[in-house]
Amino acid sequence: MNEQEQALQELKIYGFTILKSVVDADTADAMRETLIRCAEEHGTEHTHRGAARHVSNLPVLDRIFHQCIDHPRVLPLLEHFLQPSLILGSLNSRIVRPGDGYQGLHSDIPVYMLNMDTPVMMNTVWMLDDFSPEIGGTRVVPGSHKSGLGAP
């Protein structure tokens, strides 16, 4: 089973998958530095579902984020589930800092739109830093994409 086949299987069963090293270390460093600059210039404080620094519309702020839109290892996974109606809704950043605490578990899909048979949206998360006890990590509930619940 190749990477794409395994990722598709994990998405169907668990609702998420992990693709390692989608960008190389130098690109991740450049994206991180650019994101820090964008956060300083354009970021806002968000407390919705937990404290964090939020930066909206990243591709408009810097071309380095364009690769997140159509990366050849990521886009085919989205296309598999969302064709022919694939639309980029947003490309934003949620920067969790030491002391920001946990974000509450939630679905990004409004409850009235939840559909366990056909996905109506998918998110990609681009981790530019390693997880650590200070900043934590993204929490997921395996299988919750089939639960029909707005907050697993």
Name the predicted role of every residue range:
Residues M1-Y14, L19-M116:
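Non-heme Fe(II)-dependent double-stranded beta-helix
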Residues D100-P152:
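Catalytic core of non-heme Fe(II) oxygenases with the double-stranded beta-helix
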